[in-house]
Regions:
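Preference for extracellular/luminal or secreted protein segments
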Residues: 1-26, 258-472
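Second-shell residues forming the walls of enzyme active-site clefts
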Residues: 10, 36-56, 60, 68-71, ...
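Acidic (Asp/Glu)-rich catalytic clusters
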Residues: 21-27, 48-55, 155, 201-202, ...
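Catalytic domains of carbohydrate-active enzymes, especially glycoside hydrolases
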Residues: 22-34, 101, 108-113
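Short beta-strand elements of ligand-binding domains
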Residues: 60-64, 115, 438-446
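A charged helix-plus-loop insertion that forms the helical arch/lid used to bind
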Residues: 76-91, 134-136
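A substrate-binding/cap region within the structured catalytic cores of diverse enzymes
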Residues: 89-111, 118-134, 146, 150
Length: 472
């Protein structure tokens, strides 16, 4: 038994460090790449080639969702629409085409596994971490598009990952920072949250990612990532999934707060997880500590060695499958939706449409919330598309000064994300509205207030579509 075989750490840098190369030669199961590992397509391919040269069975993964969450385009903003826009467009062929384009780019970069799609049903509009990463609020629609996304990306030889099992959509907390609880009963969970996972499994999804959430109706004692009833019971025995169960990053507080990553790794394996994503920055000493904790747990009987061996074999099987097809040509990639189609999915109030029809200068104002850990600090919306804001306001800014940046006679265009979740943003919007004509744009998941235009995404492509609607 080699504990390294089930570990998938992250690191910082554009080239493979010597210590990580040695871990790969020693049998490390995979490497998870993040924005800190991506400088250019050529550099990324050289990095993945180096990883595979050190261990041909290593699974190279990346968080590329084709929208707000993008590692390939973290520096410039994503050219893809994102799941919420695709759900509103509700054309499964368009969703499959976007996923195929994502898959083709990942295959060219030497990536084996994309940690996508997000198949959560966004049941709570206050959700701080899912939102526009979801295909929507209707389980049947989310299921259709989840299956299409899986089919599209896997047709290019890149494995997909349906996440976050058994459903992270009905939470008002971010599991990067806390341990959320989904209080729904079992009947609701089966009717609302599970259909997209079932559809993904039917589409042949290679992997499923766990969520660091409590679901008392399924397991009152442990988070899903550590839960035998949820992973071995519901996912394996109940739904019949035989692929690789991947954990969400174990450095997230929802998994490791109060126990540490090594203990979280042991619990995840015991629960039924196979490939353990450790996080974005895992130094050699930490990898060693996790491997030692797994070995010690097997030695003292608190972790079944057969369970670790089973997990390692599932990871190796995934690695072998990719090693055999890495040189295969990708399938043809169809055209994907453009700005015009994206613009058609926007919600635009009658008042905003009338204001935008007037021939007058625009003053763009930017509301900049603290960035979501999953999304990262990526360029977004019209600002990724080249718009210069007359003023930018964050949580500690002065709303009056923000409003004063609008020139006389201009139409104020206030652009933010999830405006309804931020009292400081609502105060700023009120201040700008108080000085004159204003159009408020929400590029996140809109609430029932403070949005004249709702775009349901903030990728660079969605920003281009917004520019076409509003003009300069």
């Amino acid at each position: 038994m080699n504990p390294l075989a089930v570990l998938m750490p992250g690191f910082v840098g554009y080239t493979l460090p010597a210590w990580l190369e040695q871990r790969l030669r020693d049998g490390l199961g995979g490497v998870c790449l993040f924005a800190a590992n991506v400088e250019s397509p050529a550099q990324l391919r050289a990095l993945t080639d180096a990883i595979h040269a050190a261990n041909p069975l290593a699974v190279v993964s990346i968080d590329e969702e084709g929208g707000d969450v993008s590692r390939l385009y973290q520096a410039v903003g994503s050219p893809f629409p994102g799941n919420a826009v695709l759900g509103r467009l509700d054309d499964a062929a368009a969703t499959e085409a976007v996923a195929a384009r994502v898959g083709a780019e990942l295959a060219a970069a030497g990536v084996d596994l994309t940690l996508a799609p997000d198949v959560d049903v966004n049941a709570d509009p206050r959700n701080p971490v899912i939102g526009v990463r979801s295909f929507g609020t209707d389980p049947a629609r989310v299921a259709r598009h989840s299956a299409a996304w899986v089919a599209g990306v896997q047709a290019q030889g890149v494995s997909a990952c349906a996440k976050h099992f058994p459903g992270h959509g009905d939470t008002a907390q971010d599991s990067h920072h806390a341990l959320p609880t989904v209080d729904a009963d079992a009947e609701t969970l089966h009717a609302r949250d599970l259909p997209p996972f079932v559809a993904s499994l039917d589409a042949g999804v290679a992997t499923v990612m766990t969520s660091h959430i409590m679901v008392p109706a399924l397991d009152p004692e442990l988070p899903a990532t550590f839960s035998r009833p949820i992973l071995r019971g519901l996912l394996r025995a109940g739904l019949g999934f035989e692929g690789v169960i991947v954990t969400d990053a174990l450095d997230m507080k929802g998994a490791s707060e109060g126990r540490g990553i090594p203990a979280a790794a042991v619990l995840a394996l015991a629960g039924g997880a196979d490939l353990l994503c450790l996080g974005s920055v895992n130094p050699d000493e930490e990898i060693g500590a996790v491997a030692d904790a797994i070995a010690a747990a097997v030695a003292d009987g608190s972790l079944d060695g057969a369970r670790v061996a089973d997990a390692a074999e599932r990871c190796a099987a995934l690695g072998r499958a990719h090693a055999e097809r890495r040189t295969a040509a990708s399938s043809a990639v169809p055209e994907i939706v453009g700005a015009a189609e994206v613009r058609g999915t926007f919600d635009v109030s009658d008042e905003a449409a009338a204001a935008l029809a007037a021939d007058r200068p625009r003053a763009w104002l930017r509301l900049e919330p603290a960035f979501n850990v999953a999304v990262g600090n990526a360029p977004w919306g019209p600002f990724a598309a080249g718009v210069d804001a007359a003023a930018t306001l964050g949580p500690d800014g002065d709303p009056a000064s923000f409003a004063a940046a609008v020139p006389a006679g201009a139409l104020a265009v206030v652009v933010g994300k999830d405006n309804h979740r931020h009292p400081w943003a609502l105060a700023a919007i009120d201040a700008v509205r108080g000085r004159g004509d204003t159009v408020v744009v929400d590029m996140g998941w809109p609430g029932d207030v403070a949005a004249d235009v709702a775009t349901y995404g903030a990728s660079r492509l969605v920003g281009d579509a917004l520019l076409e609607l509003i003009g300069h």
